[in-house]
From Swiss-Prot:
Expressed by the venom duct. Is mostly present in part 5 of the venom duct (distal part near the pharynx), and less abundantly present in part 4 of the venom duct. This is Conotoxin TeAr151. Belongs to the conotoxin T superfamily. Residues 23-47 form a propeptide. The lineage of its organism: Eukaryota, Metazoa, Spiralia, Lophotrochozoa, Mollusca. Contains 2 disulfide bonds. It is found in: Secreted. It comes from Conus textile (Cloth-of-gold cone). The modification Serine amide is found at S60. GO terms for cellular component: extracellular region. Residues 1-22 form the signal peptide. The keyword Chaperone does not apply.
């Protein structure tokens, strides 16, 4: 029964604590959108290199 007040106080402290990112951003952080664009460009380049005949669908840029 002695632990209950301590538990309640801890819950109140946790609930009132400001939400802060656990890991602050650094200058090396990269947004995911450009990374996704780079992956798409790389995949398109690889598709073009794999295609060896001009009549195949992958060569038409689709």
């Amino acid at each position: 029964m002695r632990c209950l007040p301590v538990f309640v106080v801890l819950l109140l402290l946790i609930a009132s604590a400001p939400s802060v990112d656990a890991q602050p951003k650094t200058k090396d952080d990269v947004p995911l959108a450009p990374l996704h664009d780079n992956i798409q460009n790389t995949l398109q380049t690889l598709r073009k290199k794999v295609c060896c005949r001009p009549m195949q669908d992958c060569c038409s840029g689709k």
